[in-house]
């Protein structure tokens, strides 16, 4: 089900009901770009601590925006054993351009090309995107609205409002007190802006909104004062309603937060960063503060990438490269619990995905996330209970077996493989760091070293000294392969990095200690009395 700005407000009550009744919610987000082309030191690498990775990625999140959010609400069907219905919705979003708010964001050509390849409709994003704002933006616009201190930022709106003001001013010159005129075809945000600007500019008029037109009435100044302070003028309620419309998807985001349902994604770290930045607050500089904020918003996070990694190793499933392939393996006869697993059906208004595969459409991927979660949880449950597996498992039992994976979110290309949102991060389990010593290759660069090894395996490279480089990979077999391949190389010497042996600081300290010890020994020998 696709939801744009035209349908969003009418859909809110149903959406709230679906979230409240869900056992969990699947999530996927599509962006206008993933990572900005930063200079090499600012690019993420396997050398990064989680806090370093976060600060580098934060810049990209601030540069790009969300074009589509997919949510799939999974609810167990009452009276039916281990059966779930999925309500999957695509939300097309576009940043609020209202009053003082006017966002800037970038497009990345590769991301646009990728989504276009999978049929993404950019017209729905640009023309009918649901507005949204974070709490900081909401405070600014609320302050501006409620105080009546209004500025129009959009050049298009400025031109339209100038025409309206000129029209009303010409009418006022000939109008008598009590006369009124109608401005047709004005509704929504524009109607609000027109009324605020007219009331600010002209002290002898009053405005009333009627469906899709604004009525302007000429009044005396005492009458204007009375209308502004009269209880019958529901301006405050009207302003609150307009603010609600301007908040758009952020209203539903708060409903999602309030519901506190488990949130399920696949490689969901970027999704969480954007949720924080776009709907909650600008991303803080502190990595720990970011973790605390996300945990308070969504106390139960499950990343299916993290869950399936372990299962794939243990059951020796075929290698997969994307979420759809994960889903297909778990839905095939390779899964020993395929026939006893949960039954998942699509809601009546969401039948599209029952017949069509739509990879990289946000709602479809959100549905895949939820389905993979249920299938993997059932597999884990059977392994725990063996042949005496629970006959009619309920979702809380699935959550119990998933407990080791809760709030463990996969991290792509960093010093640790995952982030723990409910406590300290776990130590790295990456392969050991290798050190490359270069002989007879003056002026060699990190890029040249990278190209030297890229045909054998992929390493992140960091200069250590003028003739030494640190190499790091995320695969143990690659580290072993390079150590073996370059064991007797004439110009490139590769070995395991040992801090006590290779660290310049420790080497310097050992040299100083050696010198001090030598001089102490000499002094001792020279100071001994001759026999």
UniProtKB/Swiss-Prot annotation:
<feature type="transmembrane region" description="Helical">
    <location>
        <begin position="506"/>
        <end position="526"/>
    </location>
</feature>
<keyword id="KW-1133">Transmembrane helix</keyword>
<comment type="similarity">
    <text>Belongs to the CAF1 family.</text>
</comment>
<keyword id="KW-0472">Membrane</keyword>
<dbReference type="InterPro" id="IPR051181">
    <property type="entry name" value="CAF1_poly(A)_ribonucleases"/>
</dbReference>
<dbReference type="GO" id="GO:0005783">
    <property type="term" value="C:endoplasmic reticulum"/>
</dbReference>
<dbReference type="InterPro" id="IPR006941">
    <property type="entry name" value="RNase_CAF1"/>
</dbReference>
<dbReference type="InterPro" id="IPR012337">
    <property type="entry name" value="RNaseH-like_sf"/>
</dbReference>
<feature type="binding site">
    <location>
        <position position="30"/>
    </location>
    <ligand>
        <name>Mg(2+)</name>
    </ligand>
</feature>
<keyword id="KW-0540">Nuclease</keyword>
<dbReference type="GO" id="GO:0005789">
    <property type="term" value="C:endoplasmic reticulum membrane"/>
</dbReference>
<dbReference type="Pfam" id="PF04857">
    <property type="entry name" value="CAF1"/>
</dbReference>
<keyword id="KW-0866">Nonsense-mediated mRNA decay</keyword>
<feature type="binding site">
    <location>
        <position position="365"/>
    </location>
    <ligand>
        <name>Mg(2+)</name>
    </ligand>
</feature>
<feature type="binding site">
    <location>
        <position position="28"/>
    </location>
    <ligand>
        <name>Mg(2+)</name>
    </ligand>
</feature>
<protein>
    <recommendedName>
        <fullName>Poly(A)-specific ribonuclease PNLDC1</fullName>
        <ecNumber>3.1.13.4</ecNumber>
    </recommendedName>
</protein>
<keyword id="KW-0256">Endoplasmic reticulum</keyword>
<dbReference type="GO" id="GO:0003723">
    <property type="term" value="F:RNA binding"/>
</dbReference>
<dbReference type="GO" id="GO:0001825">
    <property type="term" value="P:blastocyst formation"/>
</dbReference>
<dbReference type="GO" id="GO:0000289">
    <property type="term" value="P:nuclear-transcribed mRNA poly(A) tail shortening"/>
</dbReference>
<keyword id="KW-0269">Exonuclease</keyword>
<dbReference type="GO" id="GO:0000184">
    <property type="term" value="P:nuclear-transcribed mRNA catabolic process, nonsense-mediated decay"/>
</dbReference>
<dbReference type="GO" id="GO:0004535">
    <property type="term" value="F:poly(A)-specific ribonuclease activity"/>
</dbReference>
<keyword id="KW-0812">Transmembrane</keyword>
<keyword id="KW-0694">RNA-binding</keyword>
<dbReference type="GO" id="GO:0046872">
    <property type="term" value="F:metal ion binding"/>
</dbReference>
<feature type="binding site">
    <location>
        <position position="271"/>
    </location>
    <ligand>
        <name>Mg(2+)</name>
    </ligand>
</feature>
<keyword id="KW-0378">Hydrolase</keyword>
<dbReference type="GO" id="GO:0007283">
    <property type="term" value="P:spermatogenesis"/>
</dbReference>
<dbReference type="InterPro" id="IPR036397">
    <property type="entry name" value="RNaseH_sf"/>
</dbReference>
<comment type="function">
    <text>3'-exoribonuclease that has a preference for poly(A) tails of mRNAs, thereby efficiently degrading poly(A) tails. Exonucleolytic degradation of the poly(A) tail is often the first step in the decay of eukaryotic mRNAs and is also used to silence certain maternal mRNAs translationally during oocyte maturation and early embryonic development. May act as a regulator of multipotency in embryonic stem cells. Is a critical factor for proper spermatogenesis, involved in pre-piRNAs processing to generate mature piRNAs.</text>
</comment>
<keyword id="KW-0479">Metal-binding</keyword>
<keyword id="KW-0460">Magnesium</keyword>
<dbReference type="GO" id="GO:0034587">
    <property type="term" value="P:piRNA processing"/>
</dbReference>
């Amino acid at each position: 089900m696709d939801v744009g700005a035209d349908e969003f407000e009418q859909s809110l009550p149903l959406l709230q009901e679906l979230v409240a009744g869900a056992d969990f919610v699947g999530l996927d987000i599509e962006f206008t770009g993933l990572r900005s082309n930063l200079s090499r030191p600012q690019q993420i690498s396997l050398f990064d601590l989680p806090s370093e990775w976060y600060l580098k990625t934060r810049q990209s999140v601030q540069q790009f925006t969300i074009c589509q959010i997919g949510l799939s609400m999974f609810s167990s069907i009452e009276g039916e054993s281990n059966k779930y219905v999925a309500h999957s919705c695509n939300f097309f979003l576009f940043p609020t351009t209202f009053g003082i708010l006017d966002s800037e964001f970038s497009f990345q050509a590769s991301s646009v090309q990728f989504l276009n390849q999978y049929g993404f409709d950019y017209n729905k994003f640009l023309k009918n995107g649901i507005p949204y704002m974070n709490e900081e933006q909401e405070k600014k616009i609320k302050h501006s609205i409620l105080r009546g201190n209004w500025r129009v930022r959009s050049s298009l709106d400025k031109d339209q409002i100038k025409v309206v003001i000129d029209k009303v001013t010409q009418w006022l010159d000939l109008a008598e007190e009590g006369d009124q005129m109608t401005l047709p075809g004005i509704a929504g945000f524009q109607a609000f802006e027109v009324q605020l600007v007219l009331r600010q500019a002209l002290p002898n008029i009053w405005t009333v909104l009627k469906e899709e037109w604004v009525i302007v009435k000429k009044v005396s100044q005492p009458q204007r004062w009375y209308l502004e302070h009269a209880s019958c003028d529901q301006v405050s309620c009207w302003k609150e309603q307009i603010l609600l419309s301007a908040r758009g998807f952020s209203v539903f985001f708060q409903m999602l937060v309030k519901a506190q349902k488990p949130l399920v994604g696949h490689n969901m770290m970027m999704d969480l960063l954007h949720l924080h930045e776009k709907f909650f607050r600008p991303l803080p500089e502190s990595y720990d503060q970011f973790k605390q904020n996300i945990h308070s918003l969504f106390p139960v996070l499950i990343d299916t990438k993290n869950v399936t990694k372990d299962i794939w190793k243990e059951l020796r499933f075929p290698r997969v490269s994307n979420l759809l392939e994960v889903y297909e393996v778990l839905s095939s006869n390779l899964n020993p619990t395929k026939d006893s697993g949960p039954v998942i059906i699509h809601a009546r208004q969401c039948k599209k995905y029952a017949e069509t595969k739509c990879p990289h459409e946000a709602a479809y991927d959100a549905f895949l996330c939820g389905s993979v979660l249920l299938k993997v949880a059932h597999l884990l449950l059977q392994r725990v209970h063996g042949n005496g597996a629970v006959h009619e498992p309920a979702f809380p039992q699935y959550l119990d077996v998933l407990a080791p994976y809760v709030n463990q979110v996969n991290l792509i290309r960093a010093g640790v493989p995952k982030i723990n949102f409910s406590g300290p991060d776990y130590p790295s389990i990456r392969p050991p760091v290798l050190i490359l010593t270069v002989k007879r290759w003056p002026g060699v660069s990190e890029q040249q070293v990278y190209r030297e090894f890229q045909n054998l395996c992929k390493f992140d490279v960091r200069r250590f000294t003028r003739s030494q480089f640190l190499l790091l990979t995320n695969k143990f077999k690659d580290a072993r392969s390079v150590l073996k391949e370059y064991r007797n190389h004439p110009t490139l010497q590769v070995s395991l990095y040992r801090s006590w042996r290779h660290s310049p600081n420790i080497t310097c300290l050992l040299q100083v200690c050696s010198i001090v010890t030598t001089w102490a020994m000499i002094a001792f020998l020279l100071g001994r009395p001759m026999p």
